[in-house]
Amino acid sequence: MPEYPGISRDAFRHPLDQQAEAALRAFPGFDIVARKFVEFMYERPQYVSLMGNSVQVGPQQYSTLYQMFRECVQSLDVRPTPTLFVTQNPMVNAYAIGEEQPCIVMHTGLLDLLSDDEIRTVMAHELGHVKCGHTTLTQMAIWAMTTASVIGELTFGIGNMISTGLIYAFYEWRRMAELSCDRAALLVTDDWRLVGNTMMRVAGGSDRFAHELNFAAFEKQADDYRNLDEDGLSQVYKFLLYNGGGSGPMLSHPFPVDRLSYL
């Protein structure tokens, strides 16, 4: 596994991540005020909850995962070393939280589906969030969104206009942040096909039919999806799908085929 001692987040951050973060931070007072709120009202309760309700990975607990995780941490030179937790959940997912006490959480559903190399890929992706400082920004944004909503109620709806703009900026940044973390996974694994295959497995992998998954077909699917942009109406549909469109939630992640194309 390659190692990058002293690597800066700017060495691999996607330009779209940087641009979207700049837009999000443009809201006055967003950064300074929210940081202290996160420290005392968000990060610590999350850590206490994980300690009480999940399994903390260590040398004597999920030792194989612990060794894999340590290698990924060393590869990206992530400091301080995050704590890894496994939580009982069939949903194929993992996430990163915290800054003072950064944590990576992996669902059992993900561990049961993926191979060791694919699990390393996910670990590296989540460590990318920690390395890039995404965890704090996500928590700050959630707090700011809630605050803007409350202000809207107290100011006869005026603050809701602020809230709407902030929500759009937040979700746009969250999606672009994933592109940086896919790059982090690529740095650690040094295997583009492995990262792409992991995306495919998370998107629609099946243990029973794993032998029938075809990465070349998934690549073609990504190309076909991108070619839909030649039709203006399809571009509108894509925008609506990402941004709620009145019938669903805004998406926090780009579609897997989009991520594959960006990678």
Per-region residue spans from a language model:
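Catalytic Zn2+-binding segment of zinc metalloproteases
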Residues: 127-146, 153, 192
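Divalent metal-coordination and catalytic microenvironments
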Residues: 69, 106, 125, 181, ...
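An active-site-proximal "capping" alpha-helix that borders the catalytic cofactor pocket
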Residues: 69-74, 174-196
